[in-house]
């Protein structure tokens, strides 16, 4: 009986060690602590939103591209911090198929959002709006900033909840695999 107990303890230890090792290995592949990667990318429905001038944009038109959708507001301090970093990433010449959308989640106020971008010296990113809250419904958004990553097939493969350093070398290197 005493030997069986030792064997049982060893098996429990081995089982726990195996589980924690696999969890640790999985997390090594995730470049950010606040990122969730979908093991099986989630298909998304066709989403229509508006650019700064009121033109309709259909997300389906961007199949074949790596799409970053960043949800933000003008009053969000982390959004203000990360927007210039996203703008720099969007200008990175290493990315050949990158499309970034900075979607403002407030009631459209063109003067306020334009001033936000001007004050931050945003060069390439454009302002988009989600007046009908299509994104909120589709992605079940709960707060800002939130960034959704969509692969070339039009599927959500990862999501970042909270602030992200888009200039983080580990993140950029990881993201390039999807370009």
Regions found by a protein language model. Name each.
Residues 81-120, 131-138:
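Structural microenvironment flanking redox-active thiols in thiol-disulfide oxidoreductases
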Residues 58-80, 86:
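Short active-site neighborhood of thiol/selenol oxidoreductases, capturing the structured segment around
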Residues 1-46:
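N-terminal targeting signals for export/organelle localization
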Residues 115-123, 130-176:
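Thiol/disulfide oxidoreductase modules built on the thioredoxin-like
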Residues 63-65, 95, 122-124, 141:
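Active-site acidic short loop of glycosyltransferases
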């Amino acid at each position: 009986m005493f030997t069986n107990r030792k064997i049982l303890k060893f098996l429990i230890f081995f089982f726990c060690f195996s589980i924690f090792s696999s969890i640790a290995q999985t997390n090594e592949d995730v470049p950010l602590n606040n990122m969730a990667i979908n093991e099986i990318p989630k298909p998304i429905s066709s989403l229509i939103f508006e650019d700064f001038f009121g033109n309709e944009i259909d997300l389906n038109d961007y199949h074949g591209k790596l799409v970053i959708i960043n949800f933000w507001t003008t009053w969000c301090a982390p959004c203000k911090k990360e927007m210039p970093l996203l703008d720099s990433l969007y200008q990175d010449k290493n990315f050949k198929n990158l499309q970034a959308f900075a979607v403002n989640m407030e009631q459209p106020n063109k003067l306020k959002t334009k001033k936000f971008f001007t004050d931050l010296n945003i060069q390439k990113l454009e302002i988009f709006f989600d007046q009908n809250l299509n994104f909120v419904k589709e992605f079940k958004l709960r707060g800002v900033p939130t960034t959704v990553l969509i692969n070339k097939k039009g599927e959500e493969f990862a999501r970042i909840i909270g602030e992200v350093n888009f200039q983080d070398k580990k993140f950029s290197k990881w993201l390039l695999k999807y370009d």
